[in-house]
């Protein structure tokens, strides 16, 4: 079964690029044609590259890796947060702070400070302080949560980064490349494909397009989690370092939802078989 269909891509407007005067010549090979001054992206190539990116993300997570979701533009903020949260991955959908990857040691200290402030608030640590002190601590906590809340549980730099709009997120892309972290990203017609390891040619400005492709990456993460727990149908996958790590609560929940569905299918077939063999009841005669 295809990861995503051509119709879904068309319906979400993934094929629309930028105006012909706003483009990167390196993207020429991904362009199908132009209509009324707008480039049309070759969705056949998009489907091919989606499969490659999907497989990479799935294998990365299956072997214990994490994927950082990045998208701070207005069109991507909601889907980035929703999909990353759905699969328990870290995300950045507000402002990218310089050094978030290359200076992660300092960022991690700020994360510890955020957790410290939250613990103080929950355990009554603010009691006995002046109103001004409480206000300052609350403001600090709110600011940290807004900028770092999406990566609060990220204990180390990610194994890969998913990016919506590489031009806007050029700092994130540059830091990932500096640390040799693979970059998976939507490539619009004004982007540089040389900066991305796993490109997906598509529209990074439309809300539905960004949401669809982000959902595809999140689904690959979910499948990787299941593979890590041994539920994958691929029995030939070789375990790597990190594959035996204990699963987090969100991963256990994801797997608990997948297991009953897998068990229900054989049971339904077993019930259907006797029903098919039983003779059909004769309809009562309508004759007088």
UniProtKB/Swiss-Prot annotation:
Domain of life the protein comes from: Bacteria
A single Gene Ontology CC term: cytosolic small ribosomal subunit
GO process terms (BP): translation
Protein keywords: Ribonucleoprotein, Ribosomal protein
Stretches for region Disordered: 228-288
Low complexity biased stretches: 257-288
GO molecular function, one term: structural constituent of ribosome
Keyword check for Ribosomal protein: yes
Pfam family of the protein (one): Ribosomal_S2
Family designation: Belongs to the universal ribosomal protein uS2 family.
Listed name of the protein: Small ribosomal subunit protein uS2
Organism: Rhodococcus opacus (strain B4)
Lineage: Bacteria, Bacillati, Actinomycetota, Actinomycetes, Mycobacteriales
């Amino acid at each position: 079964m295809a990861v995503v269909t051509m119709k879904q891509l068309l319906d979400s407007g993934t094929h629309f690029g930028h105006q012909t005067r706003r483009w990167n010549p390196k993207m020429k090979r991904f362009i199908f044609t132009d209509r009324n001054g707008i480039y049309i992206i070759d969705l056949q190539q998009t489907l091919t590259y989606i499969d490659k990116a999907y497989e990479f993300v799935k294998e990365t997570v299956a072997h214990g890796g994490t994927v950082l979701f990045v998208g701070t533009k207005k069109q991507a903020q909601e889907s980035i947060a929703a999909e990353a949260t759905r699969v328990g991955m870290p995300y950045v959908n507000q402002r990218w702070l310089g050094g978030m990857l290359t200076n992660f040691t300092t960022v991690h200290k700020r994360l510890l400070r955020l957790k410290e402030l939250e613990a103080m608030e929950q355990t009554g640590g603010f009691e006995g302080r002046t109103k001004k002190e409480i206000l300052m601590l609350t403001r600090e906590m709110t600011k940290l949560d807004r900028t770092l809340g999406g990566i609060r549980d990220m204990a180390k730099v990610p194994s890969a980064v998913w990016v919506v709009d590489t031009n806007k997120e050029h700092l994130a892309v540059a830091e990932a490349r500096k640390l040799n972290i693979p970059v998976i990203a939507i490539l619009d017609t004004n982007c540089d494909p040389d900066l991305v390891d796993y490109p997906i040619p598509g529209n990074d400005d439309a809300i539905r397009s960004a949401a669809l492709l982000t959902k595809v990456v999140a689904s690959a993460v979910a499948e990787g989690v299941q593979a890590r727990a041994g539920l994958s149908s691929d029995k030939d996958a070789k375990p790597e370092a990190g594959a035996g790590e204990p699963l987090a609560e969100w991963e256990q929940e994801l797997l608990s939802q997948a297991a009953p569905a897998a068990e229900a299918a054989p049971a339904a077939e077993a019930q259907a078989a006797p029903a098919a063999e039983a003779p059909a009841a004769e309809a009562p005669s309508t004759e007088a």
